[in-house]
């Protein structure tokens, strides 16, 4: 169920503060965050935010198409290594 429109998008205060400071200064340094639950807002456009995936920080460059989505959507937490190919010699029918 989506968030109520009267509440507005959720962004952690510490992340929003870092984005606002960089917007005031006009700098675009990488912002490291563990806040996967924060929503991407238009103020973040053009910034690179390193989102934690449980092991490392994945750099995510924020574009227009990402607005309204959560930061965690762009940093996958699971790595798929593929299914093991079955050996034909071991199967004797």
Swiss-Prot record:
One of its GO terms (biological process) is ribosomal small subunit assembly. GO terms for molecular function: rRNA binding; structural constituent of ribosome. GO terms for cellular component: cytoplasm; small ribosomal subunit. It comes from the Bacteria. InterPro entries: Ribosomal_uS19, Ribosomal_uS19_bac-type, Ribosomal_uS19_CS, Ribosomal_uS19_SF. Pfam families: Ribosomal_S19. Protein S19 forms a complex with S13 that binds strongly to the 16S ribosomal RNA. Belongs to the universal ribosomal protein uS19 family. This is Small ribosomal subunit protein uS19.
